[in-house]
Amino acid sequence: MTDTNKLKDFRHRSSVYDSMVKSPNRAMLRATGMTDDSFEKPIVGVISTWAENTPCNIHLHDFGKLAKEGVKEAGAWPVQYGTITVADGIAMGTPGMRFSLTSRDIIADSIEAAMGGHNVDAFVAIGGCDKNMPGSMIAIANMDIPAVFAYGGTIAPGNLNGKDIDLVSVFEGIGKWNNGDLTAEEVRQIECNACPGPGGCGGMYTANTMATAIEVMGMSIPGSSSHPAESPEKKADIEEAGRAVVRMLELGIKPSDIMTREAFEDAITVTMALGGSTNATLHLLAIAHAANVDLTLEDFNDFQERVPHLADLKPSGKYVFQDLYNVGGVPAVMKYLLKNGFLHGDRITCTGKTVAENLKNFADLTPGQDVIMPLENPKRADGPLIILKGNLAPEGAVAKVSGVKVRNHTGPAKVFDSEEEAIEAVLTDEIVDGDVVVVRYVGPKGGPGMPEMLSLSSMIVGKGQGDKVALLTDGRFSGGTYGLVVGHIAPEAQDGGPIAYLRTGDLVTVDQDTKEITMHVSDQEIEERKKTTVIPPLYSRGVLGKYAHTVSSASKGAVTDFWRPERTGKK
């Protein structure tokens, strides 16, 4: 335990309650259990996205209690808070999906409001589902007080007939059922066995991608991103997060010391090597924006060209994230990449040690394992996340090409203004091999909320068309998506981007070799179409209306604040 008398000097924010005139404030705090002794200690917030509606988050309230124990053991005063979550897998394919990305910024704002409003000296943020991680990190960057992120852990794989399955197995089962390859009862068996307990979705999907990126950056406990939700190691790392944040206070380490340009470079490197989610581009841009780090969409292509894809992880591979844990986890991957010159080993982390110092305590990848391929024989010679540009996406678009055999595709567009219309077309066999399915007006402003298209993409894969039909959108894709898919097309249709003027029958080319996305329509014809195209009014009611009117382009991370360093300064 840290010397409490020494910790009194680190009450940089909670000391506002010390003076005589703050007696009323202290009266309220005494009602929560604080005493004269407590007021001598730093106040550390512990805020989680606990909720009972999803396996990703159902265990996080108990994890908050563990983090509090770590804070207490380190000599500070912990206070637990709660904020919201939106479960992507439950919202998917419904109107609720518009609230998913929106929730990222609500989480960020609510954490900042709770921690700032109560003058905490430091905090631990605990998250489990996709938007929890970037939402927490945006708040951490904006607050810039000692903070640690703690991940709720990955779910164990389900099992059916001796085979590992997961949530994406159910989504793809719908396509197979529609194609006549599975019966309704067989799909029900997959449904009933896919999710056996608590934890984030089990492949290299968005939750595990972002948890990994945060660990690589140095903002969570080493090894924690790959600890399964129900493992003893996970409980230990949650408690350690409480101790670590107090240590950050003592050492004077702030998130801005950790979240440097080099930290983001390493996060992108490991994301490429592991075959992470397309959502990593959106979220890392948003976190970098909050951290005042210069990061652009084009930077991702720089790393894509020099970092090979090594991991045989779902959605395009064989293994789930727990299998990576079994062969050494994220630290073993980092050790391998560091040894081969891909990472910055001298960066400081939330432990007070450098990346290289942290990794000394971990074993190498298990000899003979085949979850992570060697650099000499990678899954793919370059990274699987590609930024495309062209006259259909002048600001850029994001493609994930892991497991995709087709390197370029040209076909006629079939254009839909909603996912529901596109799903109906797939279910009624209107989509044929060679088509380019386009879903627009579902971007950050147009959705509003930039919904994911996992229901649609999984149906296409389930029907055996994953390599034969391209799917394009100004919306997003789940980390569980694979196939010939391109998302985040910017500018979006709602902003008058070229995708708004695409018509059914127009030829579209997606080329991963040239990194181009082209609509074969002349500039003159596009200008003519602009004269007759009516952009629908921007949604304006409630939280989605606020979001639609403030959110930036996906090419800038879909951020919702007005902070610009050249205009406002940042204190």
Swiss-Prot record:
The keyword Magnesium applies. Pathway: Amino-acid biosynthesis; L-isoleucine biosynthesis; L-isoleucine from 2-oxobutanoate: step 3/4; Amino-acid biosynthesis; L-valine biosynthesis; L-valine from pyruvate: step 3/4. GO terms for molecular function: 2 iron, 2 sulfur cluster binding; dihydroxy-acid dehydratase activity; magnesium ion binding. InterPro entries: DHAD_IlvD/Edd (IPR050165), Dihydro-acid_dehy_C (IPR042096), DihydroxyA_deHydtase (IPR004404), DiOHA_6PGluconate_deHydtase_CS (IPR020558), ILV_EDD_C (IPR056740), ILV_EDD_N (IPR000581), IlvD/EDD_N (IPR037237). Its EC number is 4.2.1.9. The modification N6-carboxylysine is found at residue 131. It catalyses: (2R)-2,3-dihydroxy-3-methylbutanoate = 3-methyl-2-oxobutanoate + H2O; (2R,3R)-2,3-dihydroxy-3-methylpentanoate = (S)-3-methyl-2-oxopentanoate + H2O. Pfam families: ILV_EDD_C (PF24877), ILVD_EDD_N (PF00920). It is an enzyme of class 4 (lyase). PROSITE patterns: ILVD_EDD_1, ILVD_EDD_2. [2Fe-2S] cluster binds at residues 56, 129, 201. Belongs to the IlvD/Edd family. Homodimer. HAMAP family: IlvD. This is Dihydroxy-acid dehydratase. It comes from Streptococcus suis (strain 05ZYH33).
